[in-house]
Amino acid sequence: MEVCKDELCESNEIHEDLLKIVDETLPEETELYDLAELFKVFGDSTRIRILFVLFEAEVCVCDLAKALNMTQSAISHQLRILKQNKLVKSRREGKSIFYSLADDHVRTIINQGREHIEED
């Protein structure tokens, strides 16, 4: 892989004041890991599609499967991942389980992502 010269420093000067600020503000490794794991969840387009459906309404697995033209098993697998990562929540009503967004942060994350990819 070729390295662009413009991306390398021509000087080896260390900026101690900047490094001190970085050291004071950089989150702990566990928080960085957890954040990276959260963003991995958004790396699957099926899960994103499920979240978009849940933006509109609380729905059961049957309705999600029909709306997304997928099997209930496939939807359930993705919902389990979303639920484990606290992006969706569920409630039982009789024989059905209904899913909804866990909170407004989920919508905000998706909307911020959409704004980012639509930038010039």
Feature names for model-found ranges:
Residues M1-F42:
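N-terminal leader segment of winged-helix/HTH proteins
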Residues K83-E93:
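Beta-hairpin "wing" of winged helix-turn-helix
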Residues Q72-R80, R92:
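Recognition helix of helix-turn-helix DNA-binding domains
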Residues P27-S73, I97-D104:
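N-terminal helix-turn-helix DNA-binding core of bacterial DNA-binding proteins
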Residues S100-D120:
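Conserved segment of winged-helix/HTH DNA-binding domains
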Residues K66, H77, K83-Q84:
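Alpha-helical residues within the helix-turn-helix
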